[in-house]
Amino acid sequence: MSLAQTLRGALLTDFMGAAWIAVREMFRRKATVNYPFEKNPLSPRFRGEHVLRRYPSGEERCIACKLCEAICPAQAITIEAEPREDGARRTTRYDIDMVKCIYCGFCQEACPVDAIVEGPNFEFATETREELFYDKERLLANGDRWERLIAKNLELDAPYR
């Protein structure tokens, strides 16, 4: 053992260095968030729970082009459509199996009228798998609930689309 190692052990420099690091870290700003009481802000591009949007007049936006169904890599979307009296096509059935969904956002990008959008909600835990099978009514209800925030996020994201 050399003299330097003996002095280092006697003066407890390693211990003092570790104690200094512990004290310094104690007063550093916390990196964690006390979820669910605190939440970090979400990006306008955040992809969460799916929604079907309506026009301001109340009519649903979906024109039953089925592009979202065709582009979905997980095959989580099922659409059935019928023509209306005025000749326009509208969906009679629009289902998303959220268990299959991989939240890639392809359905949102493919939609020509911004009818299907992945909204800001990420807290949609359920007790059964059946509750993760979203039908048209539930998707429209999600759209009605989150419309203001979705419209704002789409406006913020517009320069990049």
From Swiss-Prot:
It catalyses: a quinone + NADH + 5 H(+)(in) = a quinol + NAD(+) + 4 H(+)(out). One of its GO terms (biological process) is aerobic respiration. Its EC number is 7.1.1.-. It is found in: Cell inner membrane. The keyword RNA-binding does not apply. Keywords: 4Fe-4S, Cell inner membrane, Cell membrane, Iron, Iron-sulfur, Membrane, Metal-binding, NAD, Quinone, Repeat, Translocase, Ubiquinone. Its cofactor is [4Fe-4S] cluster. The keyword Zinc does not apply. Belongs to the complex I 23 kDa subunit family. This is NADH-quinone oxidoreductase subunit I. The gene is nuoI.
